[in-house]
């Protein structure tokens, strides 16, 4: 059974994620701030952190960067991190933070479950909805 730590200061978002992911193969835990995420990961046994980009004083980017730093000198076991992005422009932040994956809000249950499964298999996951779409207008294409 894999342990997934949901990190958000919004109870509604944590409940929404729990409803999407809860099942017999996942143990779901919750944290309301970045410090609690770091503390729980240091204790060990967390396979995936799903973190909201905007969490009080320590959001997903800071959490991810700190975890990568601590992993580098053995303070915690390596853990996959999935960021929940507020808008398409946040993809740059997700990539800079070395997150293993990201999903852009609004959250779609199927997409979130696919991302979590991929990350738990050791793969990366990028939500494709951030990419610009090409729209055909008459005889020309517009982006």
Predicted regions, residues:
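Two-component signal transduction core modules
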Residues: 49, 102-103
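His-Asp phosphorelay/catalytic-motif detector in bacterial-type signaling
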Residues: 47, 72-80
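Alpha4 helix (beta4-alpha4-beta5 surface) of REC/receiver domains from two-component response regulators
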Residues: 62, 83-101
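Acidic, metal-coordinating helix/loop segments flanking the phosphotransfer/catalytic sites
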Residues: 32-48, 52
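CheY-like receiver
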Residues: 123-143
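Two-component/phosphorelay signaling modules centered on CheY-like receiver
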Residues: 8-32, 36
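C-terminal output helix
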Residues: 107-117
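Conserved phosphotransfer microenvironments
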Residues: 47-70
């Amino acid at each position: 059974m894999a342990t997934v730590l949901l990190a958000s200061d919004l109870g509604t978002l944590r409940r929404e994620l729990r409803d999407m992911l809860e099942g017999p193969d996942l143990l779901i835990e919750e944290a309301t701030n970045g410090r609690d995420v770091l503390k729980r990961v240091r204790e060990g046994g967390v396979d995936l952190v799903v973190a909201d980009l905007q969490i009080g004083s320590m959001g997903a980017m800071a959490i991810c960067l700190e975890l990568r730093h601590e992993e580098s000198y053995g303070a915690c076991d390596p853990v996959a991190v999935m960021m929940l992005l507020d808008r398409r422009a946040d993809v740059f932040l997700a990539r800079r933070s070395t997150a293993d994956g990201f999903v852009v809000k609004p959250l779609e249950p199927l997409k979130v479950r696919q991302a979590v499964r991929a990350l738990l298999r050791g793969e990366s996951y990028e939500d494709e909805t951030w990419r610009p779409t090409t729209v055909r207008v008459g005889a020309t294409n517009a982006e």
